Curated annotation (Swiss-Prot):
UniProt entry tagged with the keyword Transit peptide: no
TM segment ranges: 18-38, 54-74, 102-122, 128-148
Keyword list, A-Z: Cell membrane, Membrane, Transmembrane, Transmembrane helix
Protein name (record): Uncharacterized membrane protein YhaJ
Gene name linked to the record: yhaJ
Keyword Cell membrane: yes
Source taxon at top rank: Bacteria
Listed InterPro entries: DUF3267
Membrane disposition: Multi-pass membrane protein
Length: 172
């Protein structure tokens, strides 16, 4: 296996740019989801109860995000390294490109619709679900940036996570 390319988001974009883009993306997603909710349920009165539940749900969503990342890899029955750090897991060893792409975008595609449905189901607390959805979307931004870079890789490539980023491996 040869290394086709190494992806390091901090080196490519910089931490400040990623954070600023993530915050802008959070605000954009919050505004768009809240406006969509208001179009579907106009005139709903919002309640400011259960703020602590909002904080707890936010923490749970971030951990569920990490678990959903691992599910496509488990479905492929790949050997994964089980080092669970707080919100940081090093699990990627020789993962096929398509599996890695699915793993990167699946948290956003699974969690965001659930949060929007929860906003419709509990209209008095919709602003909480829209905020969590926005925060989660900002948390997904590095995954989207990695996915955009992986799309350009050869179809038969494998992904290996190293300490400084991801390596895209191709066979000779």
């Amino acid at each position: 296996m040869n290394c086709w390319k190494t992806i390091n988001l901090m080196k490519d974009y910089g931490a400040v740019r990623i954070i600023l883009t993530a915050v802008c993306f959070m605000i954009l997603v919050f505004i768009s989801t809240f406006l969509a909710f208001e179009l579907l349920r106009p005139g709903t009165s919002l309640s400011d109860e259960y703020v602590s539940l909002f904080g707890g749900l936010l923490v749970v969503i971030l951990f569920v995000h990490k678990v959903i990342h691992v599910l496509p890899i488990i479905c492929k029955k790949r050997k994964i390294e089980k080092k669970f750090y707080i919100l940081r897991m090093r699990t990627w060893k020789r993962i096929p490109k398509t599996t890695m792409l699915i793993s990167l975008v699946s948290p956003f595609l699974l969690i965001t619709p659930v949060l929007f449905y929860a906003a419709l189901a509990f209209p008095n607390h919709a602003h909480y679900f829209c905020m969590i959805s926005g925060i989660h979307a900002g948390y997904c931004l590095p995954d989207f940036l990695l996915a955009l870079k992986l799309i350009k890789a050869p179809k038969t490539a494998f992904i290996d996570q190293e300490a400084d980023g991801l390596d895209i491996l191709v066979e000779k």
